[in-house]
Amino acid sequence: MCKIYLMAKSFLKDVLLGFSSLCDRTAAPLRLLLAVSGGADSMAMLSAFLELKSDINAEIFVLTVNHNIRPEKETLGDAQFVLDFCNDKCPCILAEIPKNTVFDEAKNRKTGIEDAARFLRYNEFEKAADSLNADYILTAHNKNDNYETVLMRLFQGSEPEALMGISPRRGRFIRPMLNISRSEIEEYLKEKNIPWREDATNLEASYLRNKVRHNLLPVLSICFDGWQSGLDKSLAKIKAQNDFVIASYKTKKEEWVLDKKEDCCRCKFLFFLSLDEALKLKFLQEGLILLKGKRRIPYSVFDDLMKLSDTKKIIFSGGFCIKKEGDEVLLFKAVTEEKTSEVFYSIWIDKPCSFDTPAGNFKALENDDGFFIVHESDKTCGIGPFKPPFCVRSRLFGDEIETSSGSKKSVKKIINEWNIDYENRNILPIIEEGGVVKGIYGAVFGKKNWYVVGDLGVKR
């Protein structure tokens, strides 16, 4: 009993310390909105703040979101679990995102389901916080989540700022458990006899975060005992160096001038040449932000554009152009005759239909087995069956598909083996069902179709 009490007390102390270091409001009582899914992390956070609310003089409110992207029994079960737990403890709001809204948002944003669900979920957080006049919105990200995020960004070639990991505070969003590990969270829940729900999608290997969590991290622990400490030290050094670059950048004597009439950014050519590589990168990022909105731009584009010089006076890359014109540098959006990979499409199928893609016209046909996708030039029955709703889209970074041996193979590698022309690679139809790539329609470019159907295995 004494050990349980001490463990619980230590956990509460860590949560309180994390919260206090991020909270700058002195008005009382604080109104806190907790984002609770029913999983271990958010249930531990909720339980902790219910115990701490008198110490911090706070009113606790809970929001749980039903995304309607998992089976109804499972997703409604999670929501009802949270509602029941909060019943006599604190007010709880259930936000229902209508069915297919996440899929439609993924199509509109040209992203995956996870990103679309997060975008909609955070919109619900903001709306609920506004209606409750909440001071802060609390999410239950923990130390493990942060390491996973850092490693994913590291291997994706992210910038130094992104390698700082999950931000502890962004606006009124606070993450008080970033210094608490998942094992500490589960130990606290077990010792306090607090129930939680398991999300089956946390085990699905199709999601990059799950691959990192279940495959990469165990190997790191075997090969590099205590790797977390080493990573922390490296990140601290990167942060110090990046802070120096940012401080140096703020002393620059010129800025981009946005020319709205010409839809371009301008600066002095000699000033651009005078910047060293790190500052030139920051300067280009600033210019492209003025031009692009929020679209992610690969580092290779910046690397190309930085090469502007007296001998190389015009450069096209990634849908942008930088050129020397007189004594100025002009930066603007431009599509050239160069081949571009900036193609994305996504069509969600939930009923028989005909639809157009950059790869041509397709039909979604239904029979007793399910849905089949057939290209206009295909004389066969096409590819399938698939269970709706499913998506026909262009490829995304990290796409993988099952092989006949049961292992996974990257779609990029398959495309390379098929020798698909560069301009056709990003219009090759990919079929995604339940967040998993289940088919590649290779026949549109004279290749064999590749698809996975239930227990029947891989068909090529």
From Swiss-Prot:
Keywords: ATP-binding, Cytoplasm, Ligase, Nucleotide-binding, tRNA processing
EC number(s) on file: 6.3.4.19
Enzyme superclass (EC): ligase
Reactions accelerated catalytically: cytidine(34) in tRNA(Ile2) + L-lysine + ATP = lysidine(34) in tRNA(Ile2) + AMP + diphosphate + H(+)
Highest taxon above the source species: Bacteria
Cellular component aspect of the GO annotation: cytoplasm
Binding, ATP: 37-42
Signal peptide: none
Cellular compartments annotated: Cytoplasm
Gene Ontology MF terms: ATP binding; tRNA(Ile)-lysidine synthase activity
GO BP terms, alphabetized: tRNA modification
Its job: Ligates lysine onto the cytidine present at position 34 of the AUA codon-specific tRNA(Ile) that contains the anticodon CAU, in an ATP-dependent manner. Cytidine is converted to lysidine, thus changing the amino acid specificity of the tRNA from methionine to isoleucine.
PANTHER family, sorted: TRNA(ILE)-LYSIDINE SYNTHASE-RELATED
Membership in a protein family: Belongs to the tRNA(Ile)-lysidine synthase family.
Domain note: The N-terminal region contains the highly conserved SGGXDS motif, predicted to be a P-loop motif involved in ATP binding.
Name of the molecule in the record: tRNA(Ile)-lysidine synthase
